[in-house]
Amino acid sequence: MASKVKQVILDLTVEKDKKNKKGGKASKQSEEESHHLEEVENKKPGGNVRRKVRRLVPNFLWAIPNRHVDHSEGGEEVGRFVGQVMEAKRKSKEQQMRPYTRFRTPEPDNHYDFCLIP
């Protein structure tokens, strides 16, 4: 297909040169066509496609309960809020890891009494 485009451009330039030699002006339409075809020739396929990487965003805001702010409590409120954020992060991590840890079960208390594997 690229060779066909080059051939069309070559034909248009030859035609334009012939008209210029005869003294007549090349038609405006042929100039526009040759200009458009040159633009098409210079373009690379898929050159402007950007591939974005999807990153996992830690979405733990759903787990933070609505807080009623009492400005008279200063230090305790900060500690409580930090605890809530840590708990929310832990919950979100558990939710994200749930498909991977589905079949793992903890060992019972008497596991080593009955285990035959040394």
UniProtKB/Swiss-Prot annotation:
It comes from the Eukaryota. GO terms for cellular component: cytoplasm; microtubule; nucleus; spindle pole. The keyword Metal-binding applies. The keyword DNA-binding does not apply. This is Protein BEX4. Keywords: Cytoplasm, Cytoskeleton, Metal-binding, Nucleus, Ubl conjugation, Zinc. PANTHER family: PROTEIN BEX4. GO terms for molecular function: alpha-tubulin binding; histone deacetylase binding; metal ion binding; molecular function inhibitor activity. Zn(2+) binds at residue 115. InterPro entries: BEX (IPR007623), TF_A-like/BEX (IPR021156). May play a role in microtubule deacetylation by negatively regulating the SIRT2 deacetylase activity toward alpha-tubulin and thereby participate in the control of cell cycle progression and genomic stability. In absence of reductive stress, acts as a pseudosubstrate for the CRL2(FEM1B) complex: associates with FEM1B via zinc, thereby preventing association between FEM1B and its substrates. The gene is Bex4.
